[in-house]
């Protein structure tokens, strides 16, 4: 019995340590969901940072996360994030809601605000396509 309890304790510790690296989002999983649309927009062949940025915007538009007016659709973004969040889901969603209370806001400003709010909670997360 003691051995079983110890084994369970070790598993809990390992899971805690695995998520204690500052990461809140399983970025490989999220990017795997988004990458095809971003690649269709020419990300891999983009010669400049601006061209890469434009390809990401185009991909997010294809997915319905960003409108043609370059506004973030918060609920659609949450839907994409949902099964990729490892920890702090409430904090992540609250940050999105605080940065865009209307549900549709300028994407660049909203993402900047969002990342500033979650940086201390999720310092290990970086959102950049491969």
UniProtKB/Swiss-Prot annotation:
Signal peptide residue numbers: 1-18
Lineage: Eukaryota, Metazoa, Ecdysozoa, Arthropoda, Myriapoda
Predominant location: secreted
Post-translational modifications reported in the UniProt record: Contains 4 disulfide bonds.
Name listed for the protein in its UniProt record: U-scoloptoxin(17)-Er1a
Keyword Disulfide bond included in the entry's annotation: yes
InterPro entries reported for this sequence: PBP_GOBP_sf
Family: Belongs to the scoloptoxin-17 family.
Localization (cell): Secreted
Keyword annotations from UniProtKB, A to Z: Disulfide bond, Secreted, Signal, Toxin
Gene Ontology CC, one term: extracellular region
Tissue-specific expression: Expressed by the venom gland.
Secreted listed as a keyword: yes
GO MF: odorant binding; toxin activity
């Amino acid at each position: 019995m003691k051995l079983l309890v110890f084994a369970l304790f070790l598993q809990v510790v390992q899971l805690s340590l695995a998520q204690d690296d500052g990461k809140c989002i399983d970025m490989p999983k999220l990017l795997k969901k988004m990458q095809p649309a971003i690649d269709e927009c020419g990300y891999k062949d983009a010669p400049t940072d601006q061209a890469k940025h434009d390809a990401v915007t185009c991909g997010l538009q294809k997915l319905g996360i960003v409108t043609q007016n370059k506004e973030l659709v918060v609920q659609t973004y949450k839907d994409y994030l949902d099964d990729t969040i490892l920890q702090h889901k409430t904090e992540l969603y609250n940050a999105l809601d605080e940065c865009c209370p209307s549900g549709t806001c300028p994407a660049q400003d909203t993402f900047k605000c969002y990342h500033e709010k979650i940086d201390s909670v999720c310092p290990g997360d970086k959102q950049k396509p491969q």
